[in-house]
Amino acid sequence: MNLDTFDEHPPYRLIPSQDLYRIQLARSRPGHRPIGQLRVAPAGARSGRFCQPDQRVAYFADSPETAGYEAFGRREQEWLSLDFLRRREVVWAQPGKELSLLDLTLHAAEWPVLQATRFAETQALSRAVKWHAEGRVVISGNRTIVLA
């Protein structure tokens, strides 16, 4: 991966009126502090593809369907119990200010890791590019927004 290629592309601008969705636990786990209404895993949990040891990371999607795919389909769930689904909720949010994000969608074809469940590789990529912007945009059917 040549990270210099990111400098050639304009950032993705996430505007304050843009709708974002995520699926999260309806209740926080013991020891996990929410951020407002968001229930985000603590730093170092390494529970998601772009998680980091020193930052809390929140995953959002541009539609409820993409949020569902990211939460359930990407993890290759073959079946989901109703109890499992009842313990989750869909959250709608809008950014409080414009954010400049690194857009990785242009690289999805040449870097299949962006669409994979290979956590170690995507976490390494996230560490390498975290200084480029306030977040990342990765392709997953529709856009998935990763904010750290």
Named regions from a protein language model:
Residues 47-78:
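Extended catalytic/binding region for NAD+/ADP-ribose chemistry, centered on the ART fold
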Residues 1-45, 49-51, 75-148:
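Active-site and NAD+-binding cores of ADP-ribose-processing enzymes
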